[in-house]
């Protein structure tokens, strides 16, 4: 049975609101927000951020086309994007623009609430669901220059009653609709990935079956202006844990960067597009064929940035490991099997973010 223990998303600690801190117009940021050298936006010896390369773009209309040649070309693009980049943008995805506009305005409205209102949705001791910060594992840990609101949306019976049902009505209705649309989009991508991977017919549904009764979590991110952006980080470099993440940029301020061949590349969201990335669990299931990659959020000194990341992960009781038909004498298993997704959730969220350290712990 799925238990409340399995769905406690980590060990959150009470941290001051960065949004409120930014209102103090500080000349210098507190020491807890100063990054280690390797996590600075441009650490000594790092490659210059490349603004000329762009992540691949996948056209969903072509991906689901009834014309075999059109579908095959887009499948090849999807397969290449997952292997070479681990990130891509999707266009012509079918999500109504009015819903996207509501997501943008309602989340902005939430972060515009007074602190007294937002704290009603604050994280409980030992859990990161709610308003606060994620992945704070110790009192001396460097903190991200961001506030978040994290909420589990699927499965329905595991929603926290003190959170979802208490959200302001417009936001609650918007998140409900958005949750449904994101699940539909993610399932299209999972099913097409199966086809692109050309796994054996007996296992052709192995990926989509694992995600059919998915765990879905949303994280709304608020990155306020920072007086010393060169010393801070909005989101520590890391790879995502689960299956697929679908990110929506809520305003025009850029900040997402991905690591590709040792260089940090700024992602410039296309109009009416979503940014999608492969998570650690999907890398494990594809035995390393599809890549989860390090990414981070940087901040600036003048403008706030907002986004919402929707994580699409397996159901809690699914056993996670490489798909057996992808294991051959020439491609032996790279990752261990045997743990359920629920067990891995607890392990992952008990850590601080640290690159791909969790995935590395799963290697054979």
From Swiss-Prot:
Name the needed cofactors. Answer: Fe(2+)
Q: Where does 2-oxoglutarate bind?
A: 305
Recorded hits in SUPFAM superfamilies, A to Z, give: Clavaminate synthase-like (SSF51197)
Q: Does the keyword RNA-binding apply?
A: no
Residues holding Fe cation: 238, 240, 295
Gene3D superfamilies per record: B-lactam Antibiotic, Isopenicillin N Synthase, Chain
Give the Fe2OG dioxygenase domain ranges. Answer: 214-314
Q: Note the InterPro entries from the entry.
A: DIOX_N, IPNS-like_FE2OG_OXY, IPNS-like_sf, Oxoglu/Fe-dep_dioxygenase_dom, Plant_2OG-oxidoreductases
Keyword annotations of the record: Dioxygenase, Iron, Metal-binding, Oxidoreductase, Transferase
Cite any additional comment in the entry: No detectable effect on alkaloid content in RNAi specific mutant.
Q: Which family does it belong to?
A: Belongs to the iron/ascorbate-dependent oxidoreductase family.
Q: PANTHER family from the xrefs?
A: OXOGLUTARATE/IRON-DEPENDENT DIOXYGENASE (PTHR47991)
Reported function: Non-heme dioxygenase that mediates dealkylation reactions such as regio- and substrate-specific O-demethylation and O,O-demethylenation in the metabolism of protopine, benzo[c]phenanthridine, and rhoeadine alkaloids; cleaves a methylenedioxy bridge leaving two hydroxyl groups. Catalyzes the O,O-demethylenation of methylenedioxy bridges on protoberberine alkaloids such as allocryptopine and protopine and the O-demethylation of cryptopine. No activity with (S)-reticuline, salutaridine, papaverine, (S)-corytuberine, oripavine, (S)-scoulerine, pavine, noscapine, codeine or thebaine.
What's the protein here called?
Protopine O-dealkylase
In its UniProt entry, the species of origin is given as: Papaver somniferum (Opium poppy)
